[in-house]
């Protein structure tokens, strides 16, 4: 049903497949689609093991097809979804779902997202990529498929989404600057970090993310992975990718051009803005997510990262520069 239904304005609706629909990014992608019901038609959903949540989404959205990564749960899922809904299972089922729509949101965790990335690009779909592991661990495998006719890769990570928007201005780039909130332990010394708890690490001050990304954010490992992701996405040398701590998380990233001009993308920290951008690109949609109240915004702070207290950032740079299997080892 790729582009089959018509919008009220006469254009074709954009069909959407959300793989990893029960996780943080997946559920927010469905919120974006619900906010623009005359533009987006969710035709496929997939999850790894969350049968009840996936079935509830299917009953609400009425997709044509659902897929469950754990094949042993397929029969249970089939009993709960609306009649007539096709049920797929296993890794092949997840990959198949990635070919069923105009836009594929890859919100799968870890390496399990790689087949989804490859299937979407091979099918010539627009890939709204939240699964950074696909590029970090398997960049040389993924990159050739970006040249598939019709294939588009639009990043969902707020930082890379910001860079994607700034680069649209054109012109030679001097460097990109990726912002980091600093996480829940910003300002703490290496000695103080020895006594923190998992619960504290999971209490991110700005973003609502899955547990793995939240833990990685507390150590700045996530920011290091984003440096490698930026290298793969935009083809810049690691010396041209910098990180700066920005606790308000309103400036999502910046691009400095060779003439000294710097462009930045600003919005309130709401992942739905970046998700909506990737789903609608190259268009813009009139959703309420991420809008700034400029009368309430009083300051924007920036500082260099503390690489002594947070050595994971330097480790990621080293792995990226080494290349080969080092990035895959880092993200394993």
Where are these regions (language model features)?
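Extreme N-terminal basic, low-complexity initiation segments
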Residues: 1-8
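Catalytic, metal-anchored helix/loop core of enzyme active sites in primary metabolism
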Residues: 8-332
């Amino acid at each position: 049903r790729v582009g089959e239904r018509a919008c009220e304005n006469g254009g074709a609706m954009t069909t959407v497949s959300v793989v990893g629909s029960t996780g943080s990014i997946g559920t927010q992608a469905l919120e974006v689609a619900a906010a623009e019901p005359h533009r987006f038609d969710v035709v496929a959903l997939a999850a790894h093991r969350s049968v009840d949540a996936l079935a509830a989404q299917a009953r609400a959205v009425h997709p044509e097809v659902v897929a469950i990564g754990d094949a042993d749960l397929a029969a249970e899922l089939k009993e709960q979804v609306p009649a007539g809904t096709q049920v797929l299972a296993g890794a092949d089922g997840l990959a198949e779902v990635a070919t069923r729509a105009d836009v594929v949101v890859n919100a799968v965790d870890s390496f399990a997202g790689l087949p989804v990335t490859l299937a979407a690009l091979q099918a010539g779909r627009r890939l709204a990529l939240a699964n950074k592991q696909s590029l970090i661990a398997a960049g040389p495998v993924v990159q050739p498929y970006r040249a598939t006719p019709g294939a588009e890769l639009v990043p969902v990570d707020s930082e890379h989404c910001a860079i994607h928007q700034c680069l649209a201005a054109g012109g030679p780039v001097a460097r990109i600057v990726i912002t980091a909130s600093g996480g829940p332990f910003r300002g703490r010394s290496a000695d103080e970090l020895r006594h923190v708890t998992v619960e504290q690490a999971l209490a991110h001050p700005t973003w609502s993310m899955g547990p793995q990304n939240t833990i990685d954010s507390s150590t700045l490992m996530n920011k290091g992975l984003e440096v490698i992701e930026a290298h793969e996405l935009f083809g810049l040398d690691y010396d041209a990718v910098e990180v700066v701590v920005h606790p308000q998380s309103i400036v999502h990233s910046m691009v400095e051009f060779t003439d000294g001009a710097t462009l930045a993308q600003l919005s309130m920290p709401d992942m739905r803005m970046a998700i909506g951008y990737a789903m609608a690109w190259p268009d813009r949609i009139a959703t309420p997510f991420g809008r700034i109240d400029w009368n309430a915004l009083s300051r924007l702070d920036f500082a260099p990262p503390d690489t002594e207290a947070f050595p994971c950032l330097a480790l990621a740079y080293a792995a990226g520069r080494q290349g080969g299997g080092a990035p895959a080892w880092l993200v394993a």
